[in-house]
Each structure stands twice: as C-alpha cells, then as structure tokens.
Amino acid sequence: MDVDKIEHKEEKIALAKKILDKVKDGQTIGIGSGSTVYLAVIEIEKLLDEKNWSITAIPASDEIEELCKKNSHIKIGNLVENEIDWAFDGADEIDENNNLIKGGGKALFREKLNMLSTNTTTYILVDNTKFVKKLGEKHLLPVEVFPRALNYVADELRKIGATEIIYKGMTDNNNSIINVKFENTDLDEKLAKQIKLITGVIETGLFCNFNITVVK
C-alpha cells in the first residue's frame, strides 16, 4: 500500500493513535485490513520500537501480514496456537446498532474469524463518513464464494432478493468475492444467515451483533 496515496490520511492516523494505549508487551492482537488498519500498524510499530516491546499479530490479510513481518518486534501467530487478547479493524459502513458491512478489501472471512476469536473486544476505527442509518446505503454487500460455485450462488442470491451481482476478483484465501445489491431487503442478521445457508458461500460481509468498541 502506498501510504502517500491514502485518502484522509491525517484523520486516519489520528484514529490509529487512539488505540495505542491498548497495546501491552507480550499481547496477541488480531489485526484487520484496510488503509486505516495499515496506518495503525505503522503507529504500533513506532510504539514497540520506542518501548522495546514485542507482540504477536494475527493479521486478516496478506498485505497486513507482510507489513508486520518487516518489524522485528512483531511475531506472526495463528489461531491454532494463539489466543487473541483484543483486535482492531475498520469498516465500510456502521449503523446505529453497531452492525457493520465489511469486506471491501476482500479479507472478510479472516476478519470475521479474528473478531469471533478475541477474548475481549474488537476496536472498530471509523470516521464520520462510515456511519449510516441503514446498512447498504453506500456499499454493496461483499460475499466470499468458492469459485466453482459462483453461478449457483448467484442464482440462489437472486431468489432471496439480490438485484445486482458484481464479480470483484479473488481473496487472499483464493476464493471469489462478489458484491451484491439488495433492494427492499434489510441487510441484517436474518439475511446473513440465509446467505450462509447457500452451498458455496464461505462468508458474508455482514457483521451483526459482534462485541465491538467503536473508535471515532
């Protein structure tokens, strides 16, 4: 990621600095994806260098993992051998009940896995542009799909109200990612469960009723 090309960079750095007091020596931290998270990792690296602390990171994306590997104070862990003390991530949208749309960066499965695996909370770093009254106002819903099931999944999504399906490429897990538009359908936990029941769906970008703490 080219840091100089990140939009609203200074605002995102200010957000990133708000979680620095959560970092302690020896912790295992789940790390999401996206530009705000990328900048937060850079700020955490500065803190680790200054304090001579070390942490274990469990990144949700290959891009964040590569960034972490560049710092000698960060060890890359996994969910088999490590337990996450706390996590942080960004969001594409957040509603009044702290439900989220995530996955625009194609890392939604591992992001959700981190959030489900943390012992405490996940800090969600968001600026004012991410807040919406109703999920789906600004972004389509990302859905991660086993590649050979794309056509079948698309047909099944249309049966439950999808009006537009856009192929967006591949995830770090070598699955396909599609963005799905629903009209006259609430993007909520009920819909997330419906989508997950479709054979071939790996995960959805709906994050409903998770233990999160909003940082804004």
What are the language-model segments listed below?
Residues 2-89:
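N-terminal active-site beta-alpha-beta segment that forms phosphate/nucleotide-binding
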